[in-house]
Amino acid sequence: MENVLGFVALAAGLIIGLGAIGACIGIGIMGSKYLEASARQPELMNALQTKMFLLAGLIDAAFLIGVGIAMMFAFANPFQLV
């Protein structure tokens, strides 16, 4: 039983850690491409900024869904009978 709970804790940590790394890399790449596009065509900066912030929110939402799933794994009892 202790092994299963240990693996669940490890899995929850991996879900949160890898999700955070992926979200940070994605937002970083998106921000750099936004700056490149704004430098090339400054007249499109407002439209691009709106889309960038919308996508940043969606990327963060995907990470937070992963955190919720990890918390469900962490606090659920796999040995509970239905």
UniProtKB/Swiss-Prot annotation:
Assembly behavior: F-type ATPases have 2 components, F(1) - the catalytic core - and F(0) - the membrane proton channel. F(1) has five subunits: alpha(3), beta(3), gamma(1), delta(1), epsilon(1). F(0) has three main subunits: a(1), b(2) and c(10-14). The alpha and beta chains form an alternating ring which encloses part of the gamma chain. F(1) is attached to F(0) by a central stalk formed by the gamma and epsilon chains, while a peripheral stalk is formed by the delta and b chains.
Molecular function (Gene Ontology), one example: proton-transporting ATP synthase activity, rotational mechanism
Superkingdom of origin organism: Bacteria
Membrane topology per record: Multi-pass membrane protein
Similarity annotation: Belongs to the ATPase C chain family.
Pfam families noted in UniProt: ATP-synt_C (PF00137)
Main location: membrane
Example of a GO cellular component annotation carried by this entry: plasma membrane
Residue ranges crossing the lipid bilayer per the database entry: 7-27, 53-73
Function: F(1)F(0) ATP synthase produces ATP from ADP in the presence of a proton or sodium gradient. F-type ATPases consist of two structural domains, F(1) containing the extramembraneous catalytic core and F(0) containing the membrane proton channel, linked together by a central stalk and a peripheral stalk. During catalysis, ATP synthesis in the catalytic domain of F(1) is coupled via a rotary mechanism of the central stalk subunits to proton translocation.
Name this protein carries in UniProt: ATP synthase subunit c
Record's keyword terms, sorted: ATP synthesis, Cell inner membrane, Cell membrane, CF(0), Hydrogen ion transport, Ion transport, Lipid-binding, Membrane, Transmembrane, Transmembrane helix, Transport
Locations listed in the record: Cell inner membrane
Record keyword Secreted present: no
Reversibly protonated during proton transport, annotated site positions: 60
